[in-house]
């Protein structure tokens, strides 16, 4: 039995709107707001008049802000919680809104706020207590007589005469009704004077006619009294276990050995107060005795049931581990999706920046990705299977090679996903700029983050996986230097050459081999030289570095692709220290937003109107010169500033005559890398819109074009259009045919034309019947084909695993020199080799990246096999192996050992980003930075 729950309600119905991660943004609906206190926890309960389960929000240590808008009409209050949920209440009574704001402000400060009984509900029009007050005077005498369970009526004041609690239909042991009333009156006075804690009886929670006083203190006393009585009953039973004891008044449930007597009509308060009792002792009709099987008391002297902790409202049971179903040779897709979804920064940037999903086309990959990501942990396998089909269809609409059920390469699928997601974000930014969304609310009532319609949405691929490499080409004849910059989402590295005299090579060796300096054939524009050297350095680092290990080689003699089963060490940490410069930019911070960075960049550009944004080119003292093949950072900022302030061009001319004006350039040194990226995004959006032209429509793939006002109703809208278009087309066809008939017909009157119309109608009906039959037959064939494909998939998986097991001994014996025969080996000094070996376990060197996921290909052939993925779960702080629908726990050492021959794609996260995410997960803090969460529909 729990303590009483004081409640604060809104009285009448109010308009309510909720924004949270589970619902998105709901519409305005009428309902009731209640604030409950239970076990020192305060919750907000929202009940909608339209029905459905009530919504519960925790208020204890969760209130972020309370806003009260006092307008000419009804009052509006906005409650913002720390878990990114927002509850908006409209049409509140002035007094109710005032009291509710005071209470919520008290909860926000962490002070205890409990409703007092002397602050009754009449003071501000709210309801206190467990239920609505009911007037007892409205009950008829027969109603009062037929309520034997209302024993709590005895605790009221004796201002009115009482009716006996017995029912005329039951047999009673009392001689007369009048004498029973006198006995009860006397017992009532004695019990009220001696044992006041029994005045609030247990059956009161079922009594609809009881008063609505706040009974917190009395209920606590009653519970303590019941607990003491239960202890005493257990002690008596333990001292005399074999002696049948009569029903004692100190026993809460009664004696185990007492005979069942349902003919007695006395209530719990009518039991005699003496320790001895006659065999006809009365038993409560509400509280069952111990002989009832389902009311057995646990054999303990210290019963702690009253203080049993209740589960938290926000505490949700962890769902079982489950993967993705195989739709038919789609293991490559499942492995890549699991690796991408395991990246917290990627998931947050995809879901928690408030993308208006209704404005995104239904079949866009961005929307399909977000929908699957949001539902993958809470949906059954059947629902996820359908979501996977939609993701596959969105990919296949652009890349037809992924349609059907053929086996595909996991790296090709990954590259297609990342490129297509980038395109979708660019399209939505462009459509959002050209067609701002209109809200149905006045501007004064919108939230701050809903007003801005010119924002830029951050691309999850750009801020997480994309990095920039600077290629430095140096002419060997004249020393001229040309700089080229190139953006990548991943790197494809070669297998290091394996020899008997060398130890086992690692992924670090392959990465260093990729960035080695090399000689190329190059035609110099200055001296017409034909040879040059090129070196590669990182100019911007990613949060997540994706490495693709080339395990396939083409056999020219057999004209076949073969898989290399060479062992490669998988280090826990990689370092890019030797491939970075002093100007290399670090990964973007977790809270970075393209919109915020662009706003700050534009403010800085507006504050300086006459400064130059171009640095003096630094030429080396040698005879060589430096050319930049891409826009420098200063040029990018210059273009953005020139877009907003065309007068800056004149300032550049003045700068040539007034060198002292260059001092003001230092104000632009505050523009960091993140703001620079925002400037690039803004400039690219502007250039794209200019290049497209006013009459040119943006090109898009089938079913993924942008421009629909409401993608949620897109399917229904298309169905309505098809339904309306069909008879229209028939009429147009009919009109054209009739026109031709009029030109060729003979003047035989109207009868020939009517016969032709009737014949056309019959042909139309026959065609419709044939079409329906063809559709039904195609559906049956599709179902049969899917069943055959499932069987073929099972057989293919079994054969692939069997082939891998049979070829494993051969692989173990033939990998001594199976690496890249034409490649070069990295040569390290002893100190460098020891430093790299130590860093592989500790990650102490700067710009180190930690292993977080491995996609492996199991099988000896490049044309067959099976893909699985091992990922590090940030929330569980453990490694998981995803094999389609099967999920199992594993260890990092096991992954490093078992995937040294089959590892194909490796995901490494920057050490600083990894540690920051780990700390946030341990602290239970959301990494969305308070951004709006809109779930895809």
From Swiss-Prot:
Keyword hit for rRNA processing: no
Domain UIM: 672-691, 766-785, 788-807
Ranges of residues in domain USP: 322-911
Class of the enzyme per the UniProt entry, highest EC level: hydrolase
UniProt-listed Gene3D superfamilies: Cysteine proteinases, Ubiquitin carboxyl-terminal hydrolase 26/29/37, pleckstrin homology-like domain
Similarity comment: Belongs to the peptidase C19 family.
Pfam families associated with the record: UCH, UCH_N, UIM
Keyword annotations: Cell cycle, Cell division, Hydrolase, Mitosis, Protease, Repeat, Thiol protease, Ubl conjugation pathway
Active site as annotated: 331 (nucleophile), 866 (proton acceptor)
Amino acid composition bias (Polar residues), ranges on this chain: 132-149, 609-625
GO terms assigned for molecular function: cysteine-type deubiquitinase activity; cysteine-type endopeptidase activity
Motif KEN box 3 location, chain numbering: 742-744
Motif residue range(s): KEN box 1: 38-40
EC number: 3.4.19.12
Motif mapping: KEN box 2: 204-206
Protein name, UniProt field: Ubiquitin carboxyl-terminal hydrolase 37
Listed GO biological process terms: cell division; central nervous system morphogenesis; cranial skeletal system development; G1/S transition of mitotic cell cycle; protein K11-linked deubiquitination; protein K48-linked deubiquitination; proteolysis; regulation of protein stability
Residue positions of motif D-box 3: 162-170
């Amino acid at each position: 039995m729990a303590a009483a729950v004081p409640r604060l309600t809104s009285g009448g119905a109010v308009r309510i709107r909720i924004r949270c991660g589970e619902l998105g943004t709901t519409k305005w609906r009428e309902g009731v707001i209640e604030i409950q206190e239970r076990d020192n926890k305060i919750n907000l309960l929202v009940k909608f008049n339209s029905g459905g389960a009530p919504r519960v929000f925790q208020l204890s240590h969760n209130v972020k802000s309370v806003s009260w808008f006092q307008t000419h009409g009804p009052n509006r209050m906005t409650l913002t919680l720390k878990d990114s949920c927002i509850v908006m209440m409209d049409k509140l009574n002035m007094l109710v809104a005032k009291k509710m704001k005071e209470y919520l402000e008290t909860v926000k400060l962490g002070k205890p706020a409990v409703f007092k009984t002397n602050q009754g509900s009449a003071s501000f029009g709210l309801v206190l207590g467990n239920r609505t007050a009911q007037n007892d005077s409205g009950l008829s005498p027969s109603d009062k007589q037929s309520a034997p369970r209302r024993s709590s009526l005895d605790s009221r004041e004796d201002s009115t005469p009482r009716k006996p609690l017995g029912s005329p239909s039951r047999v009673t042991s009392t001689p007369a009704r009048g004498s029973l009333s006198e006995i009860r009156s006397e017992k009532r006075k004695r019990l009220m004077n001696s044992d006041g804690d029994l005045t609030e009886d247990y059956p009161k929670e079922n009594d609809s006619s009881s008063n609505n006083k706040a009974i917190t203190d009395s209920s606590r006393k009653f519970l303590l009294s019941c607990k003491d009585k239960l202890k005493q009953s257990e002690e008596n039973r333990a001292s005399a276990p074999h002696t049948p004891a009569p029903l004692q008044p100190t026993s809460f449930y009664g004696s185990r050995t007492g005979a069942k007597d349902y003919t007695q009509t006395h209530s719990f308060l009518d039991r005699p107060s003496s320790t001895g009792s006659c065999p006809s002792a009365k038993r409560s009709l509400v509280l069952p005795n111990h002989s009832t099987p389902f009311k057995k008391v646990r054999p303990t002297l210290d019963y702690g049931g009253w203080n049993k902790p209740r589960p938290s409202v926000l505490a949700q049971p962890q769902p079982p581990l489950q993967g993705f179903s195989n739709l038919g040779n789609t293991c490559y897709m499942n492995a890549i999706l699991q690796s991408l979804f395991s990246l917290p920064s990627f998931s947050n940037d995809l879901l928690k920046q408030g993308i208006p999903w209704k404005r995104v086309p239904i079949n866009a990959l961005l929307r399909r990705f977000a929908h699957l990501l949001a539902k993958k942990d809470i949906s059954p396998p059947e629902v996820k299977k359908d979501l996977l089909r939609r993701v596959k269809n969105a990919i296949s609409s652009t890349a037809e090679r992924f349609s059907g059920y053929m086996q595909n390469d996991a790296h090709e699928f990954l590259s297609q996903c990342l490129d297509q997601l980038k395109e979708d974000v660019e399209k939505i930014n462009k459509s959002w700029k050209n067609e701002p969304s209109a809200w149905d609310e006045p501007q004064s009532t919108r939230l701050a983050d809903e007003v801005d319609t010119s924002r830029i949405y951050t691309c999850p691929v750009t801020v997480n996986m994309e990095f920039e490499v600077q290629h430095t080409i140096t002419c060997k004849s004249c020393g001229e230097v040309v700089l080229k910059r190139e953006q990548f989402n991943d790197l494809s590295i070669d297998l290091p050459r394996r020899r008997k005299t060398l130890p086992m090579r690692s992924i670090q060796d392959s990465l260093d081999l990729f960035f080695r300096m090399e000689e190329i054939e190059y035609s110099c524009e200055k001296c017409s030289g034909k040879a040059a050297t090129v070196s590669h350095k990182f100019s911007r680092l990613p949060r997540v570095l994706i490495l693709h290990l080339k395990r396939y080689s083409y056999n020219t003699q057999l004209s076949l692709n073969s898989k290399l089963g060479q062992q490669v060490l998988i280090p826990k940490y990689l370092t890019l220290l030797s491939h970075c410069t002093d100007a290399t930019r670090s990964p973007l911070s977790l809270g970075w937003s393209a919109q915020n960075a662009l706003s700050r960049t534009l403010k800085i550009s507006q504050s300086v109107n006459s400064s130059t944004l171009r640095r003096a080119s630094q030429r080396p003292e040698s005879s060589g010169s430096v050319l930049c093949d891409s826009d420098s950072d200063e040029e990018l900022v210059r273009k953005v500033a020139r877009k907003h302030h065309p007068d800056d061009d004149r300032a550049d001319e003045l700068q040539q005559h007034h060198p002292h004006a260059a001092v003001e350039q230092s104000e632009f040194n505050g523009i960091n890398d993140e703001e620079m990226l925002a400037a690039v995004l803004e400039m690219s959006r502007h250039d794209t819109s200019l290049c497209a032209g006013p009459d040119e429509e943006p090109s898009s793939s089938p079913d993924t074009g942008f421009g629909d006002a409401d993608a949620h109703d897109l399917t229904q809208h298309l169905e309505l259009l098809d339904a309306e278009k069909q008879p229209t087309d028939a009429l147009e066809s009919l009109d054209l045919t009739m026109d031709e008939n009029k030109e060729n017909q003979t003047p035989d009157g109207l009868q020939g034309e009517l016969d032709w119309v009737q014949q056309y109608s019959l042909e139309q009906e026959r065609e419709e019947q044939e079409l329906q039959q063809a559709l039904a037959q195609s559906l049956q064939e599709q179902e049969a084909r899917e069943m055959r494909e499932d069987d073929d998939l099972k057989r293919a998986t079994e054969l692939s695993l069997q082939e891998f097991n049979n070829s494993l001994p051969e692989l173990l014996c033939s990998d001594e020199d199976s690496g890249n025969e034409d490649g070069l080996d990295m040569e390290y000094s002893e100190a460098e080799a020891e430093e790299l070996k130590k860093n592989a376990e500790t990650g102490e060197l700067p710009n180190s990246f930690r292993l977080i996921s491995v996609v492996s290909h199991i099988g000896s052939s490049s044309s067959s096999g099976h893909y699985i993925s091992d990922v590090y779960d940030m929330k569980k702080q453990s490694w998981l192996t995803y094999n389609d629908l099967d999920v199992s726990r594993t260890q990092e050492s096991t992954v490093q050992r078992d995937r040294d021959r089959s590892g194909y794609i490796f995901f490494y996260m920057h050490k600083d980003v990894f540690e920051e995410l780990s700390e946030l997960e341990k602290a239970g803090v959301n990494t969305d930075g308070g951004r709006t969460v809109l779930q895809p529909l």
